Each structure stands twice: as C-alpha cells, then as structure tokens.
C-alpha cells in the first residue's frame, strides 16, 4: 500500500487527528506541507491558510489522497508516528528485535522479520492500541523497504483488523483473529 492509499483508506477521524497534531505540535512541518501541496495543485498557500482549521483538514485529506502526493504523505506519516506515536513504535521495534535509538527511529532495518515475533508483537499492540493505528503503522513501516517484508505483508493479509479500508470485524470475529 502506498502512502497516499493509507490516507485514502484511513478513517476521517484518524486523518483529522494526524493533521490536527501536525498543525498544533509540528507547526513548521504543517506550514511546509500546506505550501508544498498547494504548489503541487498550482495554488498559493494563502488559499489554504485562510480556511478554518476544519476546512484545511478537509482540503489536506482530499489532496493527500491523490497519487502524486506519495512523498509528502510518507513524510507526514513518518513524522506523526515518530513524534505522536513513539510508544507504539518502540514497543514494535523491541518486540521484533530491531535496534533503535530509544525513540522509535532505527538506522539498520533487517532483511527479514521473524514471523512468530511479529505476530506476538502485533497481537500485543492490538490489545493496547486502536487497530487502525496499528494498521497505519504496519503499512507505513512496510514503505521503509522497496518490497517491504513478507512476514508483515502476510500478517496484514491474514488479519482483517490490519487491513485499512476493510469493514471492522464483529467482536466475535476479532476475538477469533486474535486467537489464530
């Protein structure tokens, strides 16, 4: 899944949360994003900046869902995850045994990820975090290598809770998927 597709399939509440976080906590990133995306649409940034925050978020959602915005989308997701979702990143990296700086950034990514460690780690994350957040993280993490990791791709394919844009499973189904 490409970065713009993550935004296409994520819930409006999650994407609004991402944009709101960036607007309030990462102001320079937000301004640069608006300027870059506006220029890509042949608009002056002031066109977007004059809108209310909610109107800006709606414009951003529409714009980042377009195919040509992948680079910006991936950058936004990385910043949001590293800054706003640090605990999730650290738990994932620790769980699968990837060395990191203690804040969720890893310099050397492995060629393979142990499927059993991955499954146990993701089940733990799903018990603690919103499944959509875990799905966004896994799909974004997959973008860190050209072909991603087979173990992550297979796990996403096997568990509907990790599939962005898929209907949420009923509670009984979610319990069955966790038991597998």
Residue ranges and their predicted role:
Residues 2-30:
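Charged, amphipathic alpha-helical stretches
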Residues 3-6, 64, 96-98, 162-164:
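Short, aromatic- and cysteine-enriched interfacial helices/patches
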Residues 24-153:
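Acidic, low-complexity, intrinsically disordered interaction modules
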Residues 113, 163, 170-172:
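A generic alpha-helix propensity feature with a strong bias for hydrophobic helices
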Residues 150-168:
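Terminal short linear interaction segments
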Residues 170-180:
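Long, low-complexity, intrinsically disordered segments
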């Amino acid at each position: 899944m490409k970065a713009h597709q993550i935004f296409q399939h994520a819930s409006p509440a999650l994407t609004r949360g991402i944009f709101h976080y960036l607007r309030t906590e990462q102001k320079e990133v937000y301004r640069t994003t608006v300027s870059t995306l506006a220029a890509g649409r042949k608009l002056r940034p002031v066109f977007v900046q004059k809108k209310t925050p909610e109107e800006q978020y709606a414009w951003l959602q529409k714009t980042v869902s377009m195919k040509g915005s992948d680079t910006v989308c991936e950058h936004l997701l990385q910043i949001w995850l590293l800054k706003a979702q640090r605990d999730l990143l650290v738990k994932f990296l620790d769980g699968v045994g990837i060395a990191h700086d203690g804040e969720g950034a890893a310099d050397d990514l492995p060629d393979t990820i142990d499927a059993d460690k991955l499954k146990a780690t993701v089940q733990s994350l799903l018990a603690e975090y919103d499944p959509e957040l875990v799905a966004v993280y896994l799909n974004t993490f997959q973008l860190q290598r050209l072909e991603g990791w087979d173990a992550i791709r297979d796990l996403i394919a096997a568990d509907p809770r990790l599939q962005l844009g898929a209907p949420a499973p009923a509670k009984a189904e979610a319990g069955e998927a966790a038991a597998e």
